[in-house]
């Protein structure tokens, strides 16, 4: 199986970090599964992202702005023969829109993690990187129908 591990940002990781990510992914997969790291093109959201980062106002808008580039990359993955796309960002940017555009599975880590947690316990908490992420995260949790399982959310 060949899976595209799609970074949400057009900013490329260092070679050292990419090697580390590949090792982590290989540790979770069967021997015949390969992961290829991919990055979307900057279709104009980069300037807005930089401004939001400067203001420390990352509220989810930046993920919405990334969606067209992520959908474009999912279409490219399907055309290139990938069996699936896995979104690297835990806020699942572009996942729903990409699912509408392709016939291969597009996996969002947040949704997959929420459902896994709900399969092994009745209630769980979430940790998000910034307090400004909390409203967007809760909207996603509610959209996924998982709010009854989440007992608390905290930023680090």
Locate the predicted segments by residue.
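N-terminal glycine-rich anion-binding loop in soluble enzyme alpha/beta folds
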Residues: 1-64, 129-156
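General beta-strand structural signal in soluble alpha/beta enzymes
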Residues: 37-38, 86-87, 106-109
């Amino acid at each position: 199986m060949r899976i595209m591990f799609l970074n949400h940002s057009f900013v490329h990781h260092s070679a050292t970090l990419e090697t580390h990510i590949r090792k982590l992914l290989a540790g979770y997969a069967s021997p015949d599964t390969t992961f290829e790291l991919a990055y979307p093109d900057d279709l104009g959201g980069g300037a807005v992202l930089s401004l939001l980062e400067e203001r420390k106002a990352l509220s989810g808008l930046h993920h919405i702005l990334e969606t067209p580039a992520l959908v474009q990359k999912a279409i490219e993955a399907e055309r290139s023969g990938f069996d699936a796309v896995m979104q690297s960002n835990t806020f699942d940017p572009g996942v729903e829109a990409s699912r509408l555009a392709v016939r291969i599975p597009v996996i969002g880590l947040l949704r997959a993690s929420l459902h896994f947690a709900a399969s092994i316990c009745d209630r769980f908490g979430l940790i998000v990187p910034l307090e400004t992420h909390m409203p967007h995260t809760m909207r996603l949790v509610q959209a996924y129908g998982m709010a009854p399982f989440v007992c608390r959310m905290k930023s680090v």
